[in-house]
Structures are given as structure tokens and as C-alpha cells.
Amino acid sequence: IFVHEFGSDLREWEQQVRHFSREYKCITFNARGYPPSEVPEDAKQYGYKHSVDDIANLMKELKINNAHIIGLSMGAYAALLFGLKYKKMAKSLVIAGVGSGAMPQHRKGFFSMANELADEFIKKGSKKAASIISNSGSRIQLKNKDLRGWLEFKKHLEEHSNIGSALTMQQYQALRPSLMDFENEFKRMNIPVLLAVGDEDELCLEINIYLKRQIKTSGLWICSRTGHAINLEEPAAFNREVQNFLSTVERGNWLKRDKESIKDINI
């Protein structure tokens, strides 16, 4: 099950679906606020808790007991917390580009940025907001590497509901807790987790190293010279890493971190 980021929708998983559907049943969906899914006008209908439950409700509706969950950015945040709340429903978690605004030094700036972007969607529409997002620092490498892919990403973003995007930004992105607030829960997590992040995704690098240290069943893959949308920038590398991870999990060989590997941590 693929869970998309704020700046995209189910269409941005196309290169993953083409690859993984050869061996797996693949499910993509648009989050609430992203047509053709419903776009509630009530702000209370948005937020990270709703997004976590939406994954579970989708699975229940499709009569799926458990699945591999793959999320990017906002979708990765929901996927990670899904693993905390619905442990038995997750075979594994692929958590890509998670954690913008999670570090203490980023909290205030991320909150302000999220609300400013929400205002752009409301006052100037999705086309203007899409221009801002697609030209942000974490998207530049996609533009540099794959101009056609970047233009497609921008076009899809321009098509999003300005109301749904604004409310998602205000109620989910701006108000979600820092991942560091869930430290105790992460330390108890036993689900296999692959953390994936680009080394030029500045707002996510540190928090992914932090998560690696908290989640004893996690592995961390850092993709060089890569920004935020790691699955779009480096689809072949991303698919390969995820394929290897899923294969290892299904063979029962994705094990907890060996305690011996941290004995020198205080040197």
C-alpha cells in the first residue's frame, strides 16, 4: 500500500507500481482533500490521526489483514504512526523522506512555512502554490535530474484542490507533533522498517539518523545527491532498495539490531 506525500498524489507512485506489481498486489489511493477522494470543508476532518486511521479503514474495506506499507514524506509520517497504532496490520514499513520540521531547531520555521503555504493555496490558488513548492530547495535535484518528471510533478500539484491542500497544510503538516515525541513508542517497535532519505533533503537527514537509533528493527538508506522526492528522483535505486528490503523481510531475515553494534557508542 503506497501513501503519498503532500505535494503529490497516487500518480507519483507510477514507477513503483509498474515495478512491484510484477510480484505484488499494489494499492495506491488519494488522501482526503485530494480529488477524487472527498475534500471536506470542515478543518476538524483533517490531521495526522485521520490519515493514520484512513490507511486502516482502507485495508478493512478491502478485507486486507496486513500489508507492506510504503510512505513518502507526509505519507511516511502517517505510515510510521500506523505502525505504532495498528501493529498487526503492518508486515513492514518503508518510510521515505519523513520528518520535515521534526528537529527542535526546525519546529518554529516549519510551522510558519506551513501556514504561509496554506495562505498561498487559499489566496492565490494551487497553480501559484505549486510553483513555490516545486522550486523549493528539496525539489531542485528533481528538476536538475529529470526535467520532464519535475514538470509532471508540478502539473499534478497545480491540479490539486486549493481548499483540500490548505486545510491539509494547516491541520496536518503544521500541527503534527514532532516524531521525537514518540521516542518511547519507537523504542518498543518490532516491525521491520526501512528508512530512506536523500542526502540533500536537509530537513529530514538528522531526524532519520535519530529514528535509526530509536527503532531497533530499522535500516537506514541514504541516497546520495538526492532531495525530498526520493522515489521520483531515483526510481531505479529506490525500487531496488525496497525490493531487497521486502525480500529480506519475507525470508524472515530482517533482524533486530545486534546490541554489540552499539557498545562503542560512548567512546
For each of these PLM feature ranges, what is it?
Residues 1-44:
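Conserved HGGG/HGGXW glycine-rich cap/lid loop of the alpha/beta-hydrolase fold
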Residues 49-67:
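Conserved acidic catalytic loop of the alpha/beta-hydrolase fold
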Residues 71-75, 79:
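Gly/Ala-rich beta-loop-alpha elbow adjacent to hydrolase catalytic centers
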Residues 84-85, 90-124:
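Flexible "cap/lid" loop of the alpha/beta hydrolase fold
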Residues 104-109, 123-185:
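Conserved alpha/beta-hydrolase catalytic His-Asp/Glu region
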Residues 189, 195-197:
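Short beta-strand/loop motif that positions the catalytic acidic residue
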Residues 202-207:
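Conserved alpha/beta-hydrolase "acid-adjacent" motif
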Residues 218-267:
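Catalytic active-site module of serine/aspartate enzymes centered on a nucleophile-bearing elbow/loop
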